[in-house]
């Protein structure tokens, strides 16, 4: 009974806790961002802004930890920050069966992108909905974006908005610093939301592990 109560308390704390600035800075550093959370004005108030969706993602994370551990191991073995293993919670609510406008699976691959990274996509066999195969493809794609843009956080931005749009933003601003890019009105809201939510999730999970 005591163990059950402790487990329930841990789940409640993880779902309702908000990450500290220290935890957020650790997550930012892990994806190559040299500026601190406090210095990035565009991130002001994200804990309150995304409070509702953040709690929903945390509940989903607790319900899918076993499956997440499987893909997290793949990211670790590929030397890709674990931040990226949390993208599916914001992309698809960690559901492999979900479909969007031409997209499908945990990683919401378009058919063309999926095929480029080795996925079979045909009637009766769409590997975008296969957790392991689609994750392998996502890792290859993210690593290619890292090679192209030189940093992990830019790889995340490119994943969200596309390579061409990110290149235009960098050229327009004459900088690839996150504090500069995020304050540009042309920075896609969807990509900014995706980044903020994933950052909160990553920071909270690492904070909870450090407190164990």
What are these regions (language model features)?
Residues 4-13:
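Sec-dependent N-terminal signal peptides
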Residues 16-79:
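An acidic, Gly/Ser/Thr/Pro-rich helix-cap/linker signature
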Residues 57-68, 77-80, 99-107, 127-135, ...:
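Solvent-exposed, acidic/flexible segments
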Residues 80-95, 155-160, 198:
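Short, functionally critical alpha-helical segments immediately adjacent to catalytic or ligand/cofactor-binding
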Residues 97-102, 168-172:
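Short, solvent-exposed loop/turn and secondary-structure capping segments
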Residues 102-123, 135-137, 142:
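Substrate-binding/active-site groove segments that recognize
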Residues 142-173:
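Catalytic and binding regions of secreted/periplasmic enzymes and modules that target cell-wall glycans
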Residues 210-212:
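Low-complexity, Gly/Ser/Thr/Pro-rich intrinsically disordered linker/tail segments
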């Amino acid at each position: 009974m005591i163990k059950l109560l402790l487990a329930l308390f841990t789940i409640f704390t993880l779902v309702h806790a908000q990450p500290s600035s220290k935890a957020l800075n650790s997550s930012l550093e892990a994806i190559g961002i040299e500026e601190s959370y406090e210095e990035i004005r565009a991130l002001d108030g994200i804990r309150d802004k995304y409070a509702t969706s953040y709690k929903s993602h945390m509940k989903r994370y607790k319900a899918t930890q076993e499956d997440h551990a499987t893909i997290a191991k793949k990211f670790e073995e590929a030397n890709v920050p674990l931040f990226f293993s949390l993208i599916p919670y914001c992309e698809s609510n960690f559901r492999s069966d979900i479909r969007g406008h031409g997209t499908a699976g945990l990683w919401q691959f378009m058919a063309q992108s999926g095929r480029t990274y080795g996925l079979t996509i045909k009637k009766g066999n769409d590997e975008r909905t296969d957790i392991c195969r689609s994750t392998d493809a996502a890792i290859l794609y993210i690593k290619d974006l890292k090679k192209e843009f030189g940093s992990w956080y830019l790889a995340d931005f490119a994943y969200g908005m596309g390579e061409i749009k990110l290149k235009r933003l960098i050229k327009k601003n004459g900088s690839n610093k996150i504090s500069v890019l995020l304050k540009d009105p042309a920075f896609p809201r969807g990509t900014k939301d995706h980044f903020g939510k994933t950052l909160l999730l990553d920071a909270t999970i690492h904070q909870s592990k450090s407190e164990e």
